[in-house]
C-alpha cells in the first residue's frame, strides 16, 4: 500500500519562556522545563538545551518516514511566530504552520493580518486558555468575528482547541453560521 504519513499535531520552539494562568513556564536543562509549578520532561534528555527545533524534528520525521507535519502553537510554548516564520521559509514543503496571536488582550486582529501577510496558512487559538479570571474572551466578539471573516476571505484555516465541555460550543456555532467557508480544525 502506498500512502503519505502526515503528523497532524506537533510543536516547535526555540525556548519556553512565558507565564500561563499565573504559572511560569521556562526551559531548564536536559530537555526539562519548569511547567505550571512542576519540572517536566518536555523533549528527550539528549536535547540538552531544550530547543525543539525544526532540524531535529525533520531528522526524526525522515527516520519515521513522515512526509510533513502540522505545527501548532499554544500559550504554554510561548508565542513562537518569529521562529516559525523562518521554518516556513526554510521548509515550505514539510511544515504547515499555524501562527498565533496574543488573544488574551485586544489588538489580535492586526496581529493576525500581519501573520497572514508573512505566509502563515492557519491561525491557532488555544481557546481553553481564554476563560480568564478577569473575564472571558468570547469567540464571537466583534474583533474575533472580524478576524474570522478576514481569514475566510483569504482561505486561511482556523485551528482551535476548545474548553472542556460545551462552554464555547454556542460561540463556535455562531462562527460557523457567520463564516460558512472558514476551514476549521478542532483539536483536543
Range-by-range predicted roles:
Residues 60, 65-80, 85, 92-102, ...:
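Short, well-structured secondary-structure segments
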Residues 6-10, 69-72, 95-99, 121-125, ...:
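Hydrophobic faces of well-ordered beta-strands that scaffold small-molecule active sites
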Residues 122, 137-188:
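Catalytic pocket-lining loop regions of alpha/beta-barrel enzymes
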Amino acid at each position: 500500500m502506498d500512502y503519505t504519513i502526515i503528523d497532524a499535531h506537533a510543536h516547535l520552539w526555540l525556548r519556553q519562556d512565558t507565564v500561563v494562568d499565573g504559572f511560569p513556564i521556562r526551559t531548564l536543562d536536559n530537555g526539562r522545563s519548569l511547567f505550571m509549578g512542576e519540572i517536566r520532561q518536555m523533549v528527550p534528555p539528549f536535547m540538552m538545551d531544550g530547543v525543539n527545533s525544526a532540524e531535529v524534528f525533520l531528522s526524526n520525521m525522515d527516520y519515521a518516514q513522515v512526509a510533513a507535519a502540522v505545527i501548532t502553537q499554544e500559550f504554554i510554548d510561548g508565542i513562537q511566530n518569529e521562529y516559525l516564520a523562518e521554518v516556513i521559509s526554510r521548509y515550505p514543503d514539510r511544515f504547515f504552520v499555524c501562527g498565533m496571536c496574543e488573544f488574551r488582550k485586544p489588538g489580535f486582529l492586526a496581529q493576525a493580518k500581519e501573520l497572514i501577510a508573512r505566509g502563515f496558512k492557519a491561525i491557532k487559538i488555544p481557546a481553553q486558555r481564554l476563560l480568564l479570571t478577569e473575564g472571558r474572551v468570547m469567540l464571537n466578539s466583534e474583533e474575533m468575528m472580524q478576524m474570522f471573516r478576514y481569514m475566510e476571505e483569504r482561505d486561511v484555516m482556523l485551528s482551535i482547541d476548545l474548553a472542556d465541555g460545551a462552554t464555547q460550543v454556542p460561540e463556535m456555532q455562531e462562527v460557523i453560521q457567520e463564516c460558512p467557508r472558514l476551514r476549521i480544525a478542532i483539536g483536543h
